Amino acid sequence: MIKRKMDSLKTCFFGGYDKLDTLKYIDTITSEIYMLESAIEKKKNGDNFVIPGETGQRKLKGSALGGFAKPDVDSYICALLGKAAELREKLCS
């Protein structure tokens, strides 16, 4: 599981990442994690499974006013991508 518990993302008055773009990206990675976990479970049970496509890193849109704080978002996304990579490695081994 993700080591750092993230209850919320901090916002900032100026700068940061666009909120909607950030949340969409987090949702995409989280969906990939759920699909990987499901595939691992199917593999354990001997069922057919499909390896989901890899999301990978992408550049988030910036925000002039009221975006999410970059350090928090970067840390959280890094943790999510790490979890996805760990699950993908487990599935492919």
Identify the meaning behind each predicted range.
Residues 1-93:
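Acidic, negatively charged sequence signal
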